[in-house]
Regions:
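Catalytic-core elements of nucleic-acid end-processing and repair enzymes
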Residues: 1-428
Length: 428
């Protein structure tokens, strides 16, 4: 990430003249309504609506007949499919921060600074990055053994299509949303989601409280990126987390900016909108967002994330994967992990335990799959309806029903287990 000069702090008089957060929200709601009234994306230079109105065309998130809360099936350049928040009537991406830090940086980059905001040495920062990567990769390794994630990753046939549909499981984005330090910076087209994070304090374990101490938090900032369909997701560096199997990323209508792979600096493509913190406004927004439950609905994998974050060990598989990805020295990485209180269990493999599978069965009985499917929109009215019904009925489809049955887990993972056994024999 290139060096940026931080903005100077506002004076007390400048803060006094700022609008409160609710006034900022109302301002952008009006701008959004004006955008829609003036023709929306058809009134700007955007990607044209495809002539054949293909159900997964890249521009379907901008041109569709879906309700605002639906997630649009869009094909990526790599041939996979993402479930993007509907941008038909959403011209902005927002990010809220309760304090003005002078610039946007990811939680990963925050590790470069100590509690006094002093820059750590390159060696110390690298060590912290290594530990953060080990934790997030342990979580990702576990998610990759989730039966339904495996099914969606491997591809599904949805009638009347003859080719498999690969739903993109954004594992790194999921790690970000479940509390792991990553190089991602979250954005949302929902200004209320951004407003919530801008006026609340994180207490940990998905719990928040409204900011009421104006002395410690006199003003915050809403960062705004005006979407350009030809630039935002192709050149500027924004990507989609969107809807995943569990509801959290969908509730937050997640997009992200990846510091680590994008040459553009995010601070150059957003506008900071400052607001004066107000205790009554904070309480109002906190209540509107159901004390945070609107953005952090209960789900079982949040518990697994918390356990991994609190655990003092990671699997040998995760350690080896991290070593392969970063091409660092084995002994050095091992020493750094131990220095920071992380031991390597060479006999441990992340996988869904019988207890986790039982919890998944309970989730499915409580409507997890139906809730996931009912948020998805396939364009092309005739074909899209058939594909939706095919998706919804996968638990009854003999080709996929075993992914929904806990007792079939060993059969689902047999191929992966065999590959591990073969690799083990080669090492010996």
């Amino acid at each position: 990430m290139e060096t940026q000069h931080k903005r100077p702090k506002l004076t007390a008089e400048e803060i006094r003249r700022l609008p409160n957060l609710l006034q900022v929200v109302n301002r952008f709601n009006k701008l959004t309504n004006d955008f829609v009234s003036n023709g929306g994306w058809s009134s700007v230079d955007a990607e044209p609506v495809p002539n054949d109105y293909c159900w997964h065309a890249p521009s379907m998130d901008f041109h569709n007949n879906a309700e605002d809360d639906k997630f649009i099936v869009v094909q990526t350049m790599k041939g996979r499919h993402t479930l993007k928040p509907n941008l038909m009537r959403r011209p902005f991406l927002f990010r809220g921060e309760k304090k003005d830090h002078g610039m946007i940086i990811s939680s990963f980059t925050q590790e470069n600074f100590d509690k006094e905001k002093q820059l750590r040495s390159r060696e110390e920062a690298w060590e912290r990055h290594l530990v953060a990567n080990l934790k997030s990769e342990e979580f990702i390794a576990l998610l990759k053994t989730h039966p339904l994630f495996m099914m969606l990753d491997r591809g599904i046939i949805l009638q009347p299509e003859k080719r498999p549909v690969f739903i993109n499981m954004n594992y790194y984005g999921l790690a970000q949303h479940y509390g792991f330090r990553t190089g991602l910076v979250d954005f949302s087209p929902d200004i209320m989601a951004a407003a919530f994070f801008a006026c609340t304090k994180n207490l940990g374990n998905d719990r928040y409280e409204p900011i009421t101490d104006m002395g410690q938090n006199p003003y915050g900032v809403i960062y705004v990126h005006k979407i350009n369909p030809l630039l935002t997701f192709k050149i500027a560096g924004f990507s989609t987390i969107g809807l995943q199997l569990y509801p959290r990323t969908g509730a937050q209508k997640g997009f992200f900016f990846n510091e680590g792979v994008t040459p553009v600096n995010v601070n150059q493509i957003v506008a900071p909108i400052y607001f004066r913190q107000d205790a009554n406004v904070s309480r109002h927004i906190y209540k509107e967002m159901k004390d945070g439950k609107a953005l952090f609905p209960d789900d079982t994998i949040s518990k697994y994330a918390s356990q991994i974050l609190a655990d003092s060990e990671v699997s040998g598989e995760t350690f080896a994967h991290n070593l392969y990805s970063n091409q660092e020295d084995f002994d050095r990485n091992l020493e750094v992990a131990r220095k920071h209180g992380v031991s390597i269990n060479w006999h441990k493999m992340p996988y869904f335990t019988p207890e986790m599978l039982h919890e998944l069965e309970q989730d499915l009985k409580n409507g997890l799959w139906e809730q996931f499917c009912n948020q998805i929109y396939f364009a092309d009215e005739k074909k899209g309806k058939a594909m939706f019904e095919s998706l919804l009925n996968l638990p009854k489809n003999p080709a996929y029903s075993h992914y929904f049955i806990a007792g079939e887990y060993e059969r689902i993972t047999a191929y992966d287990a065999d590959m591990h056994r073969r690799a083990g024999r080669k090492r010996i």
